[in-house]
Amino acid sequence: MPWFIKTESFTKETLKLLPAQREEFISKHKDWVVNLKKLGKAISSGYLVNENKIPGGGGLLIVEAENFSAAKFLIEQDPMIVYGLVNWEMHQWIPVIGEFPTD
């Protein structure tokens, strides 16, 4: 099955939220990912950091899906997107060399 990658960054409005307010939505996102994993979906999600391990570079989600439409439908259910907290893009990833473990 093909792999799809969603990259995201907080909107300007999201960056204005207090950290506790952002964490509320991030927790909803984490719960969404955990529930998908429990349903057997191959998915991995995390955030990006700089060389000093300081977050702020955005997030990355990798998911296996039947096709582009199915992946987009699934990703559009991410609470970070539903609540309009991130700017995002999705692309199909075609691995050429190596293997990708999902856990």
Language model features by range: what are they?
Residues 1-103:
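Conserved, structured core segments of small domains
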